Amino acid sequence: MIQIDALPAFSDNYIWLLQDTAKRRCAVVDPGDAAPVEAWLAANPDWVLEDILVTHHHNDHVGGVERLKKLTGARVSGPANERIPCRDLALDEGDEVTAVGVTFQVLAVPGHTLGHIAFFSDQPATPVLFSGDTLFAAGCGRMFEGTPEQMQPALARLASLPERTEVYCAHEYTLSNLRFAKAVEPQNPHVLQRFDDVTRLRADNRITLPSTIGLERLTNPFLRTSATLVKQKADEWKGHSNTTHVAVFAALRSWKDTF
């Protein structure tokens, strides 16, 4: 049994803290800043940080790794095809890594960065996905390094995970993502309801995560490239027909980049 909590960092990052309460051991995902993790460990001195899991190389995800490694000796696991500080275990598609007693499958999800990975496990009572900056709540990451031909299939793969899978992404972008989702599907009742729910949460400065794969299928335009109305909006934006899922995705992403 693990407990998952968010440690806020910077303006909108979340460092995910996985806790094995029985054994007083923990792991963190994407510690862009060491300070929130250090503060938690100081407040919980009988706990041990055993593992640091990294999804990609951007500094807001790895900036705290070196300090935490020095302080705790935690094992650092991250993508094999990217430069990750202090990495002990290089991970690629098909690998597995165990942290706090939970075994995670490593999924290659290129697009945001070329070597980006995600961590999925169906061992907990509810399956969990740590998606980094690939899949966001109601959105997806920008393609800083990859192509639509890489990222759309990566997102479709995540969308095929069990619908009750909890999605732990790395940023609090949900409300702005839903504003875009409303522009794409202004009559989608699931989008409208989620927008209202998230607006209330953010008004109280509350976290909007985790999401679920099921909710993303209903409300995330980047997972809905097969929906007729989504394609129509993408066609309107580009001024021509987008004949493939990749083309629809690329149109949506370019629209979102300027939204």
UniProtKB/Swiss-Prot annotation:
Q: Which cofactor is essential here?
A: Zn(2+)
Q: How does it assemble?
A: Monomer.
Which reactions does this protein catalyse?
Answer: an S-(2-hydroxyacyl)glutathione + H2O = a 2-hydroxy carboxylate + glutathione + H(+)
Q: What is this protein called?
A: Hydroxyacylglutathione hydrolase
Instruction: List ligand-binding residues for Zn(2+) 2.
Output: 60-61, 133, 171
Task: Provide this UniProt record's keywords sorted from A to Z.
Answer: Hydrolase, Metal-binding, Zinc
Task: Name the positions where Zn(2+) 1 binds.
Answer: 56, 58, 112, 133
What is a GO molecular function of this protein? hydroxyacylglutathione hydrolase activity
Q: How is the cofactor bound?
A: Binds 2 Zn(2+) ions per subunit.
Which SUPFAM superfamilies does this chain map to? Metallo-hydrolase/oxidoreductase
| UniProt record, GO biological process | methylglyoxal catabolic process to D-lactate via S-lactoyl-glutathione
To which protein family does this belong?
Belongs to the metallo-beta-lactamase superfamily. Glyoxalase II family.
Under the heading PANTHER family, the entry gives: HYDROXYACYLGLUTATHIONE HYDROLASE (PTHR43705), HYDROXYACYLGLUTATHIONE HYDROLASE GLOB (PTHR43705:SF1)
> Which SMART domains does this UniProt record tie to the protein?
Lactamase_B (SM00849)
